[in-house]
Amino acid sequence: MGLSDGEWQLVLNVWGKVEADLAGHGQDVLIRLFKGHPETLEKFDKFKHLKTEADMKASEDLKKHGNTVLTALGAILKKKGHHDAELKPLAQSHATKHKIPIKYLEFISEAIIHVLHSRHPAEFGADAQGAMNKALELFRKDIAAKYKELGFHG
C-alpha cells in the first residue's frame, strides 16, 4: 500500500504546482465535488445556498475553504505516509463534529485527481495520477482507521 520514493516524488512535484494557487485549486476541487455529488453540499451549512457553478465561483468563503482543505492535504502529503500527527485532529473534527463519511473523502479524492489532470496535464500523466491515487487511498485508509477508533462508522 505504501508508495515508493519515486511515487512520492511524483506526488510532491505536482503538489508544487498546486501550492502556487491553493485557493484556486481548492475552489475548483470543491466545485467539482459539489457538482458531481450534490449530496456533499448538505454537510456545509455555509455553502448550501450556492446552487449554481456561478454562485460557487463568486463565493470568497468557498475559495477560503478550498485553500484550507488543500493546505491540510498538502501538509499530510509532505509527510509521505508518516502523517499520524496531522491526521489525528482532522479525523477528530471530521468524525465527531462534521460527520463526514469516508465515501465523501473518496468523492473529493476523485475531484482532486480530475482538477489536477485538467489544470496540469503535462505534470500529471498516468504515473503521477497513479501515485496520487495511491497517496489519497493511503490517507483515506488511515483516516478510516482513526474514525473507527473514535467510534464513527461513516
Curated annotation (Swiss-Prot):
Looking at its record, which EC class is this enzyme? oxidoreductase
Q: Where is O2 bound in this sequence?
A: 65
What InterPro entries does its record include? Globin, Globin-like_sf, Myoglobin
Q: Which reaction does it catalyse?
A: Fe(III)-heme b-[protein] + nitric oxide + H2O = Fe(II)-heme b-[protein] + nitrite + 2 H(+); H2O2 + AH2 = A + 2 H2O
Grouped into one coarse class, the protein's main location is cytoplasm
Show the GO cellular component annotation of the record. extracellular exosome; sarcoplasm
Residue sites binding heme b per the record: 94
Q: Where in the cell is it found?
A: Cytoplasm, Sarcoplasm
Location of Phosphoserine modifications? 4
Q: Name one Pfam family in it.
A: Globin
**Residues found modified as Phosphothreonine:** 68
One MF term from GO for this chain?
Answer: nitrite reductase activity
Give me any GO biological process, just one.
Answer: removal of superoxide radicals
Q: Which domain of life is it from?
A: Eukaryota
Q: Which residues bind nitrite?
A: 65
Instruction: Please state which protein family the record places this protein in.
Output: Belongs to the globin family.
Complexes and interactors:
Monomeric.
Task: Report what the protein is called.
Answer: Myoglobin
The lineage, from the top, is: Eukaryota, Metazoa, Chordata, Craniata, Vertebrata
Gene name linked to the record: MB
